[in-house]
Amino acid sequence: MTGRLHLRRRPLLVALASLGFGPASAGPRRFRVALANLDETPGTTLEGLGFTGAELRLSFELAARTLPLDMLYFDNAGDPARAIANAEAAIAARVDLLIEYNADADANAEIARRLATAGIPALALVDPLPGACLYGPDNLAAGRIAGRALGAFARDNWPDEDVLGVIIGDLSANGPAISERVAGITEGVHATLPGLRFALLDTGGQSVRADGLLTKFLQVERGRRLLIATLDDLSAVYARNAIDMNRRQSDCVIVSQGLDRNIHGGVSEKKEIDPNNRGSVVLGSVAYFMDRYGYDVLPLAMRLLAGETVPPRTVTRHVLVTATNVFREYPPFDMN
């Protein structure tokens, strides 16, 4: 009798378990992952664009909410020595993985050596870390997207007219990122307009100077159509101001790099790119999505922690965002 009762109870136990009753499941293993961010100093932006370290960190905080991760955060503050100290602190905290964002190659080599000694894997953001998979932008490709957009605009709207290219931004910045973007822009334009010449206006890292520099240029270059590529979105805003003040809206067009809040506006009412503002001289901006890095990088981290093979380099999805697709890429409400 006891045996029959036991057999009868088994289907009931199975049914209860299927409804969530019964012994608690241990759940998935949780991992400790550290992000050592490049620089979270207020007012400091990343990679010559308009994104801040705080925005990048927030994307990791939000993306981690649905993953079995316990996150630790470090601010390298743009200091190689501090980056090494932060890596040592992550090792002492016995993290399962370090996500390192540091621009100094010597410091990265030392960080990689210490991580290897501790047996801790790493993911690198933007700048290579020896032995680590890399996630970051493809600056040359992003530049080409802008250049092709400008070339196509001139072909479709200004055929057989006198056209000149203008590149505005921090042209003297250290590192390869700016030079790669400039090379991509020129290649992209020349795919449509092989003989186009470019004027270079260097803001020296001060986007506000784009207004005055372009104003002087517009006063000299009259009677020409101008294809303007700005290397950051705030420079695009100031360039647009110069065009408006000089009443040159009919013969200037701008494509920028970044797609930060200066251009897409987020949830605010002030938007440079807007379906209701299709007459703007700002045609669009090439997206870098640095404010969404967490959503792309943490899945890579989970794959590494699961023992999967991850490509040596994963590049950001770059896309030209205009008034026609801005609400698809950055809806006018808080996505988080």
Residue map of PLM features:
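Flexible loop/hinge segments that line or gate small-molecule binding clefts
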Residues: 106-141, 261-273, 278
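Hinge/cleft segment of the Venus flytrap/periplasmic-binding protein
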Residues: 29-30, 169, 189, 288-336
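Hydrophobic alpha-helical
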Residues: 88, 97-116, 185, 203-266
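N-terminal export signals
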Residues: 4-5, 11-26
